[in-house]
């Protein structure tokens, strides 16, 4: 076996190396590894006996020539069954620990000489054998080896220079070579003409020579011009390349900014969607609460309307002095029955929900102009009637206070009477509104007394039951202002703001509706209450006036005046409630429309 020297460039674990394998006298294997980045070198010399011993220890014996051929084949990657790897001492310890059972190797100090291990692996059909070759680090390389490297590098430089010259010569221009060939052809042609044209005169030869020289100069000028154009084109191309690179960098920067802005926009869209979802959930919860509140109010209203009935009580004579409770005359039993039956019929017809359409047809809308005209007519008629009547006796304190504000438009909280809810069978009114059968009226009232004419006059000019109450008035004043009769004076069959509640009569159960109940808070229920009480009041007043023969003419005139005032206040109240209902409906419609448009826009 002759001496071998092979140099191969290989990469191990991302680092480039130069591997040199050589044999000395066929008995010694020399392996040199050089790192290309910092020229670090590792070297190892192995005798044939050493190689055969390590192959025998692995269990797969190989002779020295066979081992060298296997190593060269692995370096050149000529065979798939043999390959090499370059490992450090730490890498070798990690491999040993993996084979031992996956435990981490104990910490050790770094081994001296900074060794490297060239591992040649032979993969058989059912076996894999590793042959390690330790390489020592060379701190002081051999001078002979350095000289050999220098000479090798010089030869490589010369080869590269020759190759660059050939490339540069090829880039000079094919046009220059063509011109040179053409010049040589012209020179040969000139020589031929000189030899063949012996008979031609010297003048002709000189003229042809001058012409050829002129053509030669023209060709050279064209050559120089073409070279200048080529150089200018190359400079322009380089400039365009620079502009293109700058444009690419600018476009890449803009693209990155747009990507960042797109991410921010997506984040904002996600936050807005979450906000829309939250607002939608809040709106749905609010709608559910409103629907549940409406259902509760309707249930309370139906229960209250079903449980409220008109009371029937016999008429009792008054047993005391005249007081605030004698504002109304007590009608007869028949008149009271007729008024209660009419009140029940009216309330049952208007007990349905305000939102539902009437049976007879659509309800006419409120006309403010017509309302003002009718009110003026009623006021003028009432003023004329009062002037023609005889003077009336003085009024009580509660009656004067209640009637002083008739004709003015009270606030919405003061136009409706207080509504209280209680059980139809077991009602417990407050101390100022409690009735005791067989005795006087509520606390603070005086017993109704006096002659029938005084009662007639008090009932004829009694206060409007729907006039606003004064906060500072006494309980008796409030009861008189709202038209509550006394227990002994007119509480038996007189008109009351409660359909089923006479003061101390037979059917006076004293039902009242609490002002804090859901029924009183609903505008539609308040409207129904107003209509029912108006009908009951008109029926009761009409029956009482027909039953009294002594004060028929005077009571009729005052009843018309009181009716006009009641209808005026009730109409104003209805208009106010109607405007509030329309405002509430518009608000709900706008809220739903804005929510729907926002959801559609975001989607």
Swiss-Prot record:
For bias type Low complexity, the affected ranges are 337-348
Where it sits in the cell: the answer is: Cytoplasm, Cytoskeleton, Flagellum basal body
Parts of the chain that traverse the membrane: none
Q: Which Gene Ontology terms cover its molecular function?
A: microtubule binding
| Effect listed in the UniProt record for changing residue 275 to E | Does not restore flagella formation in VFL3 mutant strains and does not affect localization at the cilium basal body
Coiled coil ranges (UniProt) are 169-289
Q: Which family does it belong to?
A: Belongs to the CCDC61 family.
The molecule here is called Variable flagella 3
Q: What organism does the record attribute this protein to?
A: Chlamydomonas reinhardtii
